[in-house]
């Protein structure tokens, strides 16, 4: 009996909890570079990239070869029991790639949420404090601490009761939405006045470009002023680069463009070309604050994932993917702005590097238009293009196409997006 998307969806509904959402009713059979083929043999352009995991594309040959070679040596020992060189070599490379003119060390884990959890643990141990300031619209994961840090309730923490204490929320600036950098800094200072003294705050955490929050880049001025506040009060600045890292913004880490260095940086997603790997890199003195046994995990920094990540870094160097990231972003932005001229419901086209978004409003207003975005996503799928939405109100289209995508494929995707807006306008 041949498999269909519908038959597999029936099995999925019966076997998998409904809390595991699924944006597209499609089951993938194979994938290569920037396209996927579903179980019914239909080819689709992938502008989602596994939610920012496939910057080097599906099954990059160099990554596949590195994993195959590692599989002939060792697949697992648990680094805390028997160590292996790929873990150490990768940490050495990450220490050089993360911005900051100071000695660094790196911890490898498995998921982005796990990386953020460990960054908070490290900050607490290093400062002897417990409080953390996060931002409206921020996304940091689905574990309990990271849910508390995440600035959106539905769907992530709805119905789960109170989140962990000691988390405080500041405003994230967006000129489009009427929140200035002054407003954001004032909201941090109000926390110091109304909720917790600075001496009780271990860390301030934010994304250099908000991901789920709508692809809103943090202004450089915000980062500089947060860095100054952290230095003034002995607070650690954590940059959550889970979605922005590994070249998505045109530099290997987005903080390279912000003019300041964070104390701790989290990374995951595209770092290992589709294999589960994440980590925290930071000042050596802070990374060493936790005693032996306080960090790690059974699968953390697996040999397979480390081999994949080392190959990813080589691919970036050999194929000049940072330059390509900028070029992809410029091409997408130019095309989307041409579409914007024709369809006034498109209120903004923005991004950093190739982390590009389109915000959609009700015509002639700044009222979020999630329905239109939902229509575009559905129509694009019918036409052979996979898109994602994001934003606090679900009214933002985001593009996370592999950096290895050819220009012709980018143009085809843009043409489909324009067709979709033409049909709903």
From Swiss-Prot:
GO BP term, example: L-lysine catabolic process
GO molecular function annotation: 4-aminobutyrate:2-oxoglutarate transaminase activity; 5-aminovalerate transaminase activity; identical protein binding; pyridoxal phosphate binding
Consequence of gene loss (knockout): Mutants are impaired in lysine utilization and show a slight reduction in the root colonization capacity.
Family matches, as InterPro entries: 4NH2But_aminotransferase_bac, Aminotrans_3, Aminotrans_3_PPA_site, Class-III_PLP-dep_AT, PyrdxlP-dep_Trfase, PyrdxlP-dep_Trfase_major, PyrdxlP-dep_Trfase_small
Catalytic activity: 5-aminopentanoate + 2-oxoglutarate = 5-oxopentanoate + L-glutamate
Cofactors demanded by this protein: pyridoxal 5'-phosphate
Protein induction: Induced in response to corn root exudates, by lysine and by 5-aminovalerate.
UniProt key word Transferase: yes
EC number of this enzyme: 2.6.1.48
Binding site for pyridoxal 5'-phosphate: 112-113, 139, 240-243, 298
CDD domains: OAT_like
Stated role: Catalyzes the conversion of 5-aminovalerate to 5-oxopentanoate.
PANTHER family: AMINOTRANSFERASE CLASS III, LEUCINE_METHIONINE RACEMASE
NCBIfam families, sorted: GABAtrnsam, PRK08088.1
Family: Belongs to the class-III pyridoxal-phosphate-dependent aminotransferase family.
Protein name, per record: 5-aminovalerate aminotransferase DavT
Naturally occurring in which organism (per UniProt): Pseudomonas putida (strain ATCC 47054 / DSM 6125 / CFBP 8728 / NCIMB 11950 / KT2440)
Gene name linked to the record: davT
């Amino acid at each position: 009996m041949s498999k269909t998307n519908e038959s597999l969806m029936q099995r999925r509904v019966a076997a998998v909890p409904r809390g595991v959402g699924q944006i597209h009713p499609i089951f993938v059979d194979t994938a290569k570079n920037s396209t996927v083929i579903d179980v019914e043999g239909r080819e689709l352009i992938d502008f989602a990239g596994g939610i920012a995991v496939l910057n080097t594309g599906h099954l990059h040959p160099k990554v596949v070869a590195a994993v195959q070679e590692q599989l002939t040596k060792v697949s697992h020992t648990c680094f805390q029991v028997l160590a292996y060189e790929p873990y150490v070599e990768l940490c050495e490379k990450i220490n050089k790639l993360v911005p900051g003119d100071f000695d660094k060390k790196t911890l490898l884990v498995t998921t982005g949420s796990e990386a953020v959890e460990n960054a908070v643990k490290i900050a607490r141990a290093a400062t002897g404090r417990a409080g953390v300031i996060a931002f409206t619209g921020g996304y940091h994961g689905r574990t309990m601490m990271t849910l508390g840090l995440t600035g959106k309730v539905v769907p992530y923490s709805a119905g789960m009761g109170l989140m962990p204490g000691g988390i405080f929320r500041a405003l994230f600036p967006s000129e489009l939405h009427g929140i200035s950098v002054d407003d954001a800094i004032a909201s941090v200072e109000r926390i110091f006045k109304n909720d917790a003294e600075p001496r009780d705050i271990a860390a301030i955490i934010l994304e250099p470009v908000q991901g789920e929050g709508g692809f809103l880049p943090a202004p450089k001025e915000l980062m500089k002023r947060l860095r100054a506040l952290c230095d003034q009060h002995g607070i650690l600045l954590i940059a959550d680069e889970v979605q922005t890292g590994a070249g998505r913004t045109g530099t290997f880490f987005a903080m390279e463009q912000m003019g300041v260095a964070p104390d701790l940086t989290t990374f995951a997603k595209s770092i290992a070309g589709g294999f589960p790997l994440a980590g925290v890199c930071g000042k050596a003195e802070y990374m060493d604050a936790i005693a032996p046994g306080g960090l790690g995990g059974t699968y953390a920094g697996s040999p397979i994932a480390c081999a994949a990540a080392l190959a990813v870094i080589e691919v970036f160097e050999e194929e000049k993917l940072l330059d390509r990231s900028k070029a992809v972003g410029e091409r997408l932005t130019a095309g989307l702005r041409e579409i914007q001229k024709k369809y006034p419901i498109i209120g903004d086209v923005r991004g950093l590097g190739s982390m590009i978004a389109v915000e959609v409003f009700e015509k002639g207003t700044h009222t979020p238009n999630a329905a239109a975005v939902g229509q575009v996503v559905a129509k694009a799928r019918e036409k052979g293009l996979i898109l994602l939405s994001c934003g606090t109100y679900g009214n933002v289209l985001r593009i996370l196409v592999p950096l290895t995508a050819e220009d012709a494929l980018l143009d085809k995707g843009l043409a489909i997006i324009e067709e979709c807006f033409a049909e709903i306008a």
